[in-house]
Amino acid sequence: MRRKEKIKALLWVAGFAGIICLIYFMLQKGEQTFGVAKDTEDQVQVETSDELEKLLWKSIKFGKKKYQYSSDYETYLFLGTDGSGHESANREEYVGNMADFLMLAVINRKEQTYALLQLNRDTMTEIDLIGKDGEGMATANMQLCTAHWYGGTEKESSENTVNAVSKLLGGLTIDGYYTLNMENISRLNHAAGGVTVTIKNDLTSLDPSMKQGETITLTDEQAYRFVRGRMGVEDGENTSRMERQKQYLEAFLAKIKENMQEDPQTALDVYDEMADVSVTNISGGTITDILTEMHTAENRGIFQIEGESRTGKHLDDGLEHAEFYLTEKGIVTTVKMLYNIKE
């Protein structure tokens, strides 16, 4: 009898121990499951936070330092190309023109402000040497204007220039581009109804009527000479021509604003007029919105990044060409002012 009681007691202890082990196992399993759920929840929160940050902020990076700026800013690149290439050819024989004129429009619709950044075409920077197929991994330190040489179509050349400008400015997000051959400035001037400028220096070598101090409404042919003339004009430097291009752009925008007061469709009409000779990924509606915004917004001015002009042989053709060197400090200072970046 006692033997049976001992066996029962042992069985009871074993059963009780089994129940304890089972409860412990279930608790441990619960903690693990809870931990997985908690980890998943944390991961979702991090991903949501990252997505929200992307919506609120854009970023650029210079060296090891990262800067953030508000996503309220929109940035568009406007290009004016020369006639040095062979852009009417098929992909195999295509050679892009060089970019004579590069201007970024920086717009903040929320704050109702805009600013422009004019870039020197001779700025030395990293260029992607893409091939006729639009592909390529090699890069070279060359003038910014040469980015438009590469590619197999005008679209690819424009996109390569966008990439070069973006890299120059720390990976800046560029929301769209508009490219126009400078040969069509006469047509653009005509579409605006003529642009009025005051001649700041003696430009009679371009046109006898372009005397210093004279205020004239440029004819279509005069407009072309005014923005394109370089060799034998003033000091022959691109920086002097940039000043005239800047002056013409300011006067052109003023003319468009004036015309829009009478006809709000002016910007779209000009866009449509130039559609067959331009290359862009910006719609007519967006262009109209941009110019409408600029019509009423505060103009913060036209910025330039200071640098040093030299000559060099980076084009590897045995000849010396103009080269313009920026400093990282100069770039960062200008970009911080443009996008109101505070540390």
Kindly label every feature range from the protein language model.
Residues A9-W12, F16, I23-E343:
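Non-catalytic, solvent-exposed segments at the cell envelope interface
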